[in-house]
Amino acid sequence: MDPNGKVALITGGARIGQVVAGALANRGCSLSLTYRDSRDAAEKTAGAARATGVKATVLRADATDETEIAAAVRETVKSLGRLDILINMAAVYQKTPNPDGVHWSAIQDANAKSAFLYSIHSAPIMKQNGSGRIVNFSDWLPVTGRPQYKDYVPYYVSKASVAALTEALALQLAPEILVNAIAPGPILAPPNLTPEENAQVLEATPLARWGGAEEIAKTVLFFVETDFVTGEFIRVDGGRHLS
């Protein structure tokens, strides 16, 4: 699919999402950006996209609320005329040493259920267009096969769910819609990372650096532009899964 003249809905457009949005806008793709709390960041991203000559709209939507998700999809089509690409980036990364049902539901809803709901509400529109692309975000660990860190049970399972969802949707929505997933590793260093923790990450990563958001944007563009890859995962982790 050529992104030029198409419309992409991006959920969770902060940080890495800003770079992904910019990459699509530079290819001539108009944008619908959803946010829950970070309106200023979403507006800034939309403004940068408009400066490239494409259209961009900003919508508030709780990624765990089906009514708001459905409304965001409808408003995207109403404002921009179509919907061709869905980038499911909204996510919660939370450490839970003593998880309970509240943790489980909140993290599963934000990470897996949201991707499912956005996909099922977007798919009929894409099928009417004759083609579509859905790009989900899992994590390098569940895609690799085994957990390596304690205290992340709900998060790990939610991202494993996204991986399973990707394969199931790829089969269900073929041949018109291609569904794939990115499994990021060390992309952006957390702001509170200590020098010791940073050194540990670099030592465990064969490429010995943080990837940067641009690497995610490149992979998103690949999944958008390919015409014969679906149900696939790409680990963008600098080889972290090898160590």
What are these regions (language model features)?
Residues 70, 91-106, 128, 146-154, ...:
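Conserved mid-core segment of classical short-chain dehydrogenase/reductases
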Residues 2-32:
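Canonical Rossmann dinucleotide-binding motif of NAD(H)/NADP(H)-dependent dehydrogenases/reductases
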Residues 213-236, 241:
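C-terminal substrate-recognition "lid" of short-chain dehydrogenase/reductases
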Residues 174-178, 230-231:
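Short, small/polar-rich loop/turn modules that mediate ligand/substrate recognition or access, typified
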Residues 100-117, 135, 155-158, 162, ...:
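Catalytic Tyr-X3-Lys loop
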Residues 74, 110-128, 142, 170-175, ...:
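Amphipathic alpha-helical dimer-interface segment in Rossmann-like NAD(P)H-dependent oxidoreductases
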Residues 29-43:
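Conserved glycine-rich Rossmann-like NAD(P)H-binding loop of the short-chain dehydrogenase/reductase
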Residues 92-96, 133-161, 166-174, 186:
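Catalytic loop of short-chain dehydrogenase/reductase
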